């Protein structure tokens, strides 16, 4: 609703301005400031949209990371179950397989949100390797050697998915959020400049129509053109809050549409589940309570200086320079149109001046002729 309400207010503002200035711009300065405002606004919207895509992709990576962690836990767990309990081992292998399929799919889908971005971790070929290992899972649980080989693939992907999450956080927090804040501040500055110019133009219009006293009575005297610092801060906070609400609403919609793949459940009776737990505890020589306290797999964070660099601005936000170039083209076309209009006005003035001189010359010639005739009549 926030975005719709904002668009409604902008539409009402445009209608009011069109009524006041007869569907024209009040000044060349207003046009220039409005184009600068539109460019800055589009830039801010692009960055906001990029943040929404990155957060949606991060959500998928986060789920994939959790699913990989659980799969590593259960795959490690399976080797502690006696070989005679084949039904239990196959049940856990199926569970691991389902979690790995879900993780692979979520990793691939996350890349779909960020087309043109090369992931430094969990690349496409790494996901393909994980999928091949997943397909061989029932054979890999047959021997210790093959089990360990599969574990190396699963654990490596799990660790690299953690590095990928780190990379996402750095890109979002250190790059996108920084650029978004700068864009919001720049947008506020342009909004303020445009507002001051429009207030000035409206005041001039009121003075033209009703006189200075009526304009002052309307609350648009010179003092209104000077916005104090407290007012600036209030407007800045209001704008930031307004944009934040719109961004949160867009992000919420985006995240609601993210299709997170969950692993297919493996149907097991309570007796089978209890038997699996008891068998694993017996293989370890530990109590059931000690096994229940088993923690998730540990993973070392990548030092920031070793983390992959963030993408370029063009990769993150698209070709923003093209928006700027379009703005410059629009300004050049507007300036040419204004020059043509001024030339036409000047030409019209010159033609009127020439016509006036011509009329004056004819009038003087007629007057001289009349005086000459009068003189001749007087002589006669």
Residue ranges of each PLM-predicted region?
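Extended, amphipathic alpha-helical coiled-coil scaffold segments used for oligomerization/tethering
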Residues: 1-48, 66-88
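C-terminal modules of long, charged coiled-coil scaffolds in eukaryotic assembly complexes
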Residues: 57, 64, 69-79, 83-380
